[in-house]
């Protein structure tokens, strides 16, 4: 949704906001962080398969991926502008869900202590 929106939304001399470097940087950051989180999850899966997964690994995974998911959702909301808080786009629901996940999966403070 966010990428498509940035391609369609026009601003400043009737150019899509996706053509602006600040928007491109946010999109690049988001996909990079999402990919890093996926790689971390894959590595933890491999460690589990090998019987080498430790609680600290799980805490690193949860702490990192929940924080990144929250930041990606916030940046996505920013890219959507005023529409980011409208029901038409589900980003606010995702943000609320992620805040819940941050709590029930253990706060980052608890995970830091485990690590």
Label the model's feature ranges.
Residues 1-115:
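Alpha-helical interface subdomain recognition
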